[in-house]
Protein backbone atom coordinates (compact mmCIF):
# COMPACT_ATOMS: atom_id res chain seq x y z
CA UNK A 1 0.00 0.00 0.00
CA UNK A 2 2.84 2.42 0.81
CA UNK A 3 4.46 1.67 -2.54
CA UNK A 4 1.18 2.44 -4.29
CA UNK A 5 0.85 5.74 -2.44
CA UNK A 6 4.40 6.73 -3.34
CA UNK A 7 3.78 5.95 -7.00
CA UNK A 8 0.61 8.01 -6.98
CA UNK A 9 2.36 11.02 -5.47
CA UNK A 10 5.13 10.75 -8.03
CA UNK A 11 2.61 10.68 -10.84
CA UNK A 12 0.82 13.75 -9.51
CA UNK A 13 3.99 15.85 -9.64
CA UNK A 14 3.94 15.76 -13.41
CA UNK A 15 0.44 17.23 -13.50
CA UNK A 16 0.94 20.49 -11.65
CA UNK A 17 2.48 22.28 -14.60
CA UNK A 18 -0.66 22.19 -16.74
CA UNK A 19 -2.76 24.71 -14.82
CA UNK A 20 -0.35 27.51 -15.60
CA UNK A 21 -0.02 26.62 -19.26
CA UNK A 22 -1.49 29.24 -21.59
CA UNK A 23 -2.87 28.04 -24.89
CA UNK A 24 -3.64 30.23 -27.87
CA UNK A 25 -5.83 27.72 -29.66
CA UNK A 26 -9.28 26.85 -28.29
CA UNK A 27 -9.37 23.41 -26.69
CA UNK A 28 -12.76 21.71 -26.39
CA UNK A 29 -13.23 19.20 -23.58
CA UNK A 30 -16.28 16.99 -22.94
CA UNK A 31 -17.08 15.77 -19.42
CA UNK A 32 -19.37 12.72 -19.07
CA UNK A 33 -20.97 12.13 -15.66
CA UNK A 34 -24.21 12.05 -13.62
CA UNK A 35 -24.36 15.84 -13.27
CA UNK A 36 -27.04 15.92 -10.56
CA UNK A 37 -24.75 14.07 -8.16
CA UNK A 38 -23.13 16.42 -5.64
CA UNK A 39 -19.79 14.56 -5.72
CA UNK A 40 -19.69 15.26 -9.45
CA UNK A 41 -20.40 18.92 -8.69
CA UNK A 42 -17.38 18.86 -6.37
CA UNK A 43 -15.25 17.52 -9.21
CA UNK A 44 -16.57 20.26 -11.48
CA UNK A 45 -15.57 22.89 -8.91
CA UNK A 46 -11.98 21.67 -9.17
CA UNK A 47 -12.19 21.67 -12.95
CA UNK A 48 -13.55 25.22 -12.90
CA UNK A 49 -10.50 26.37 -10.93
CA UNK A 50 -8.20 25.02 -13.65
CA UNK A 51 -10.35 26.57 -16.38
CA UNK A 52 -9.84 30.01 -14.83
CA UNK A 53 -6.12 29.79 -15.56
CA UNK A 54 -6.74 28.35 -19.03
CA UNK A 55 -9.37 30.64 -20.62
CA UNK A 56 -8.93 29.04 -24.04
CA UNK A 57 -10.24 25.71 -22.73
CA UNK A 58 -13.98 25.21 -23.20
CA UNK A 59 -15.86 22.56 -21.21
CA UNK A 60 -19.02 20.80 -22.39
CA UNK A 61 -20.84 18.90 -19.63
CA UNK A 62 -22.75 15.80 -20.73
CA UNK A 63 -25.29 14.42 -18.26
CA UNK A 64 -25.40 10.62 -18.34
CA UNK A 65 -27.31 10.03 -15.12
CA UNK A 66 -26.45 6.62 -13.67
CA UNK A 67 -27.24 5.03 -17.04
CA UNK A 68 -24.24 3.17 -18.47
CA UNK A 69 -25.86 2.72 -21.88
CA UNK A 70 -26.62 6.42 -22.13
CA UNK A 71 -23.02 7.20 -21.20
CA UNK A 72 -21.69 4.87 -23.88
CA UNK A 73 -23.92 6.44 -26.52
CA UNK A 74 -23.03 9.95 -25.36
CA UNK A 75 -19.32 9.26 -25.81
CA UNK A 76 -19.95 7.92 -29.31
CA UNK A 77 -22.09 10.95 -30.19
CA UNK A 78 -19.34 13.31 -29.02
CA UNK A 79 -16.79 11.50 -31.20
CA UNK A 80 -18.94 12.01 -34.29
CA UNK A 81 -19.12 15.76 -33.61
CA UNK A 82 -15.38 16.01 -34.37
CA UNK A 83 -15.00 19.11 -32.18
CA UNK A 84 -13.41 17.74 -29.01
CA UNK A 85 -9.71 17.35 -28.28
CA UNK A 86 -10.25 15.68 -24.91
CA UNK A 87 -12.73 13.66 -22.84
CA UNK A 88 -13.04 13.26 -19.07
CA UNK A 89 -15.26 10.28 -18.30
CA UNK A 90 -16.58 8.97 -14.98
CA UNK A 91 -17.15 5.35 -16.04
CA UNK A 92 -20.43 3.83 -14.91
CA UNK A 93 -19.43 0.49 -16.44
CA UNK A 94 -15.69 0.08 -16.06
CA UNK A 95 -15.47 -2.63 -18.71
CA UNK A 96 -18.46 -1.85 -20.91
CA UNK A 97 -17.30 1.69 -21.68
CA UNK A 98 -13.88 0.58 -22.98
CA UNK A 99 -14.91 0.08 -26.64
CA UNK A 100 -16.29 3.63 -26.83
CA UNK A 101 -13.09 5.00 -25.29
CA UNK A 102 -11.05 3.00 -27.79
CA UNK A 103 -13.03 4.68 -30.56
CA UNK A 104 -12.26 8.09 -29.07
CA UNK A 105 -8.54 7.35 -28.83
CA UNK A 106 -8.51 6.07 -32.42
CA UNK A 107 -10.14 9.38 -33.45
CA UNK A 108 -7.26 11.29 -31.85
CA UNK A 109 -9.13 12.36 -28.72
CA UNK A 110 -7.21 12.33 -25.43
CA UNK A 111 -9.08 10.56 -22.62
CA UNK A 112 -8.81 10.65 -18.82
CA UNK A 113 -11.13 8.69 -16.55
CA UNK A 114 -11.97 9.96 -13.08
CA UNK A 115 -13.80 8.70 -9.96
CA UNK A 116 -13.91 5.06 -11.12
CA UNK A 117 -11.53 2.85 -13.13
CA UNK A 118 -11.71 2.08 -16.83
CA UNK A 119 -10.83 -1.55 -17.41
CA UNK A 120 -11.05 -4.88 -15.62
CA UNK A 121 -8.93 -4.04 -12.57
CA UNK A 122 -10.39 -2.10 -9.66
CA UNK A 123 -7.18 -2.07 -7.62
CA UNK A 124 -4.85 0.15 -9.65
CA UNK A 125 -4.75 3.76 -10.81
CA UNK A 126 -2.46 2.96 -13.73
CA UNK A 127 -4.29 3.43 -17.07
CA UNK A 128 -5.51 0.09 -18.40
CA UNK A 129 -6.67 1.12 -21.87
CA UNK A 130 -3.83 1.38 -24.42
CA UNK A 131 -3.45 4.95 -25.59
CA UNK A 132 -5.37 6.49 -22.70
CA UNK A 133 -3.80 9.67 -21.31
CA UNK A 134 -4.46 9.19 -17.61
CA UNK A 135 -6.60 8.12 -14.69
CA UNK A 136 -7.52 9.96 -11.49
CA UNK A 137 -9.55 8.17 -8.83
CA UNK A 138 -9.32 6.47 -5.47
CA UNK A 139 -9.34 2.71 -6.10
CA UNK A 140 -12.50 1.36 -4.54
CA UNK A 141 -10.46 -1.52 -3.20
CA UNK A 142 -8.43 1.04 -1.25
CA UNK A 143 -11.64 2.71 -0.07
CA UNK A 144 -12.77 -0.77 0.93
CA UNK A 145 -9.73 -1.14 3.17
CA UNK A 146 -10.58 2.19 4.81
CA UNK A 147 -14.25 1.24 5.16
CA UNK A 148 -13.38 -2.07 6.78
CA UNK A 149 -10.97 -0.37 9.18
CA UNK A 150 -13.77 1.94 10.29
CA UNK A 151 -16.16 -0.96 10.90
CA UNK A 152 -13.51 -2.86 12.85
CA UNK A 153 -12.88 0.19 15.04
CA UNK A 154 -16.60 0.76 15.56
CA UNK A 155 -17.04 -2.88 16.60
CA UNK A 156 -14.25 -2.88 19.17
CA UNK A 157 -15.52 -4.25 22.48
CA UNK A 158 -18.73 -5.62 20.97
CA UNK A 159 -19.31 -9.36 20.60
CA UNK A 160 -21.29 -10.01 18.61
CA UNK A 161 -21.16 -6.79 16.62
CA UNK A 162 -24.14 -6.85 14.26
CA UNK A 163 -23.55 -4.95 11.02
CA UNK A 164 -26.03 -3.82 8.37
CA UNK A 165 -24.96 -2.85 4.84
CA UNK A 166 -26.66 -0.28 2.58
CA UNK A 167 -25.54 -0.28 -1.04
CA UNK A 168 -26.27 2.65 -3.32
CA UNK A 169 -26.02 1.00 -6.75
CA UNK A 170 -24.71 -2.50 -6.03
CA UNK A 171 -24.37 -3.36 -9.72
CA UNK A 172 -21.65 -0.75 -10.28
CA UNK A 173 -18.28 -2.54 -10.62
CA UNK A 174 -16.57 -0.02 -8.34
CA UNK A 175 -19.18 -0.49 -5.64
CA UNK A 176 -18.88 -4.27 -5.90
CA UNK A 177 -15.11 -3.96 -5.45
CA UNK A 178 -15.71 -1.83 -2.34
CA UNK A 179 -18.21 -4.30 -0.91
CA UNK A 180 -16.06 -7.36 -1.56
CA UNK A 181 -12.94 -5.76 -0.06
CA UNK A 182 -14.80 -4.79 3.12
CA UNK A 183 -16.43 -8.20 3.51
CA UNK A 184 -13.15 -10.04 3.03
CA UNK A 185 -11.54 -8.03 5.82
CA UNK A 186 -14.52 -8.29 8.17
CA UNK A 187 -14.59 -12.07 7.75
CA UNK A 188 -11.30 -12.23 9.66
CA UNK A 189 -12.97 -10.87 12.82
CA UNK A 190 -15.09 -13.44 14.63
CA UNK A 191 -17.01 -10.83 16.63
CA UNK A 192 -18.38 -9.11 13.50
CA UNK A 193 -21.58 -10.45 11.94
CA UNK A 194 -23.03 -8.90 8.77
CA UNK A 195 -26.70 -9.65 9.38
CA UNK A 196 -28.37 -7.79 6.50
CA UNK A 197 -27.60 -6.18 3.14
CA UNK A 198 -29.92 -3.91 1.14
CA UNK A 199 -29.54 -2.00 -2.12
CA UNK A 200 -31.08 1.15 -3.58
CA UNK A 201 -29.72 4.17 -1.70
CA UNK A 202 -28.75 5.60 -5.11
CA UNK A 203 -26.25 8.06 -3.61
CA UNK A 204 -29.11 10.25 -2.36
CA UNK A 205 -30.35 11.37 1.06
CA UNK A 206 -33.86 10.21 0.17
CA UNK A 207 -32.69 6.79 -0.96
CA UNK A 208 -30.58 6.34 2.15
CA UNK A 209 -33.45 7.31 4.43
CA UNK A 210 -35.89 4.92 2.78
CA UNK A 211 -33.81 1.76 2.73
CA UNK A 212 -32.29 2.41 6.17
CA UNK A 213 -35.81 2.64 7.60
CA UNK A 214 -36.58 -0.79 6.18
CA UNK A 215 -33.30 -2.19 7.45
CA UNK A 216 -33.72 -0.82 10.97
CA UNK A 217 -37.30 -2.04 11.16
CA UNK A 218 -36.16 -5.56 10.34
CA UNK A 219 -33.01 -5.37 12.48
CA UNK A 220 -33.47 -2.92 15.38
CA UNK A 221 -30.57 -4.57 17.23
CA UNK A 222 -27.89 -3.42 14.77
CA UNK A 223 -24.66 -2.11 16.26
CA UNK A 224 -23.16 -0.69 13.06
CA UNK A 225 -24.77 0.51 9.84
CA UNK A 226 -22.60 1.02 6.75
CA UNK A 227 -23.84 3.35 4.01
CA UNK A 228 -22.08 3.32 0.64
CA UNK A 229 -21.81 7.04 0.07
CA UNK A 230 -22.11 10.23 2.03
CA UNK A 231 -25.59 11.29 0.92
CA UNK A 232 -27.31 8.03 1.95
CA UNK A 233 -25.49 8.20 5.28
CA UNK A 234 -27.15 11.58 5.90
CA UNK A 235 -30.49 9.95 5.12
CA UNK A 236 -29.73 7.11 7.51
CA UNK A 237 -29.17 9.64 10.31
CA UNK A 238 -32.83 10.62 9.95
CA UNK A 239 -33.94 7.00 10.16
CA UNK A 240 -31.78 6.27 13.17
CA UNK A 241 -33.12 9.35 14.94
CA UNK A 242 -36.69 8.43 14.02
CA UNK A 243 -36.26 4.93 15.41
CA UNK A 244 -34.85 6.25 18.69
CA UNK A 245 -31.54 4.50 18.04
CA UNK A 246 -29.19 7.50 18.08
CA UNK A 247 -26.15 6.54 20.12
CA UNK A 248 -26.98 2.85 19.78
CA UNK A 249 -26.25 2.37 16.07
CA UNK A 250 -22.85 3.51 14.85
CA UNK A 251 -23.23 4.86 11.32
CA UNK A 252 -20.36 4.74 8.84
CA UNK A 253 -20.50 6.68 5.59
CA UNK A 254 -17.91 7.50 2.98
CA UNK A 255 -16.48 10.67 1.48
CA UNK A 256 -17.79 13.32 3.90
CA UNK A 257 -19.39 16.51 2.62
CA UNK A 258 -20.44 19.83 4.06
CA UNK A 259 -23.75 18.24 5.07
CA UNK A 260 -22.14 15.34 6.92
CA UNK A 261 -19.48 17.34 8.73
CA UNK A 262 -21.83 18.52 11.52
CA UNK A 263 -23.30 15.01 11.72
CA UNK A 264 -19.85 13.53 12.30
CA UNK A 265 -18.91 16.27 14.78
CA UNK A 266 -22.05 15.54 16.80
CA UNK A 267 -21.47 11.78 16.70
CA UNK A 268 -24.66 11.04 14.76
CA UNK A 269 -22.43 9.71 11.99
CA UNK A 270 -19.68 7.71 13.66
CA UNK A 271 -17.09 7.82 10.91
CA UNK A 272 -16.22 8.14 7.24
CA UNK A 273 -13.27 7.78 4.88
CA UNK A 274 -11.62 10.77 3.26
CA UNK A 275 -12.05 12.02 -0.28
CA UNK A 276 -11.13 15.14 -2.26
CA UNK A 277 -13.43 15.44 -5.30
CA UNK A 278 -12.37 18.99 -6.22
CA UNK A 279 -8.72 17.92 -6.20
CA UNK A 280 -9.70 14.92 -8.31
CA UNK A 281 -11.42 17.05 -10.93
CA UNK A 282 -8.55 19.51 -11.09
CA UNK A 283 -5.96 16.76 -11.45
CA UNK A 284 -7.98 15.02 -14.17
CA UNK A 285 -8.12 18.19 -16.27
CA UNK A 286 -4.44 18.91 -15.62
CA UNK A 287 -3.50 15.44 -16.85
CA UNK A 288 -5.71 15.89 -19.91
CA UNK A 289 -4.23 19.27 -20.84
CA UNK A 290 -0.73 17.91 -20.46
CA UNK A 291 -1.67 15.09 -22.80
CA UNK A 292 -3.16 17.43 -25.37
CA UNK A 293 -0.08 19.67 -25.17
CA UNK A 294 2.20 16.70 -25.78
CA UNK A 295 3.91 17.11 -22.40
CA UNK A 296 3.22 13.56 -21.27
CA UNK A 297 5.72 10.95 -22.37
CA UNK A 298 3.62 8.08 -21.02
CA UNK A 299 0.19 7.53 -19.42
CA UNK A 300 -0.17 8.72 -15.83
CA UNK A 301 -2.39 7.81 -12.90
CA UNK A 302 -2.99 9.11 -9.40
CA UNK A 303 -5.31 9.08 -6.41
CA UNK A 304 -6.08 12.68 -5.49
CA UNK A 305 -6.98 11.55 -1.97
CA UNK A 306 -3.69 9.73 -1.36
CA UNK A 307 -1.82 12.77 -2.63
CA UNK A 308 -3.85 15.14 -0.42
CA UNK A 309 -3.54 12.96 2.68
CA UNK A 310 0.22 12.71 2.30
CA UNK A 311 0.53 16.45 1.72
CA UNK A 312 -1.59 17.27 4.78
CA UNK A 313 -0.23 14.36 6.89
CA UNK A 314 -3.74 13.11 7.62
CA UNK A 315 -5.35 9.71 8.17
CA UNK A 316 -7.92 8.43 5.66
CA UNK A 317 -10.20 7.57 8.60
CA UNK A 318 -12.38 10.46 9.76
CA UNK A 319 -14.28 10.69 13.06
CA UNK A 320 -15.46 13.53 15.28
CA UNK A 321 -11.97 13.65 16.80
CA UNK A 322 -10.24 14.82 13.61
CA UNK A 323 -12.85 16.04 11.11
CA UNK A 324 -11.97 19.72 11.57
CA UNK A 325 -8.62 19.04 9.88
CA UNK A 326 -10.26 18.09 6.56
CA UNK A 327 -11.69 20.36 3.85
CA UNK A 328 -15.17 19.40 2.71
CA UNK A 329 -15.02 19.69 -1.09
CA UNK A 330 -18.65 19.13 -2.03
CA UNK A 331 -22.12 19.93 -0.72
CA UNK A 332 -23.51 16.43 -0.19
CA UNK A 333 -27.01 17.62 -1.06
Q: In which residue ranges do the predicted regions lie?
A:
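Hydrophobic alpha-helical
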Residues: 76, 89-107, 181-182, 196, ...
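Extracytoplasmic "Venus flytrap"
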Residues: 26-54, 60-78, 89-95, 169-177, ...
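Short beta-strand elements in bilobed, periplasmic/extracellular small-molecule ligand-binding domains
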Residues: 53-65, 165, 186-205
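Short, low-complexity disordered leader/linker segments with a strong preference
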Residues: 1-28, 52-53, 102-107, 325, ...
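Short, solvent-exposed amphipathic alpha-helices that sit
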Residues: 39-53, 143-147, 173-193, 207, ...
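Hinge/cleft segment of the Venus flytrap/periplasmic-binding protein
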Residues: 25-27, 123, 166, 170, ...
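Flexible loop/hinge segments that line or gate small-molecule binding clefts
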Residues: 100-142, 162, 257-265, 269
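Hydrophobic alpha-helical segments within soluble ligand-binding/sensing domains
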Residues: 71, 133-161, 207-208, 256-260, ...
Amino acid sequence: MLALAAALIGASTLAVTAASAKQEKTINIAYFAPLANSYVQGELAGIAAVLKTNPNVKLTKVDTGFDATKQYNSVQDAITQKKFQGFIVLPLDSVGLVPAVNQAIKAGIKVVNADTPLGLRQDTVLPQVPGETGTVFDPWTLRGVWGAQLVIKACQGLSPCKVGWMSSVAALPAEKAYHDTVMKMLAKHSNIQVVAEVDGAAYTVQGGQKISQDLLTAHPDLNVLVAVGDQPAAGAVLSIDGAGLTGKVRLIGGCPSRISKPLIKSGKEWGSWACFPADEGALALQFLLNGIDGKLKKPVGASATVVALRKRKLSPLITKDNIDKYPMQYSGS
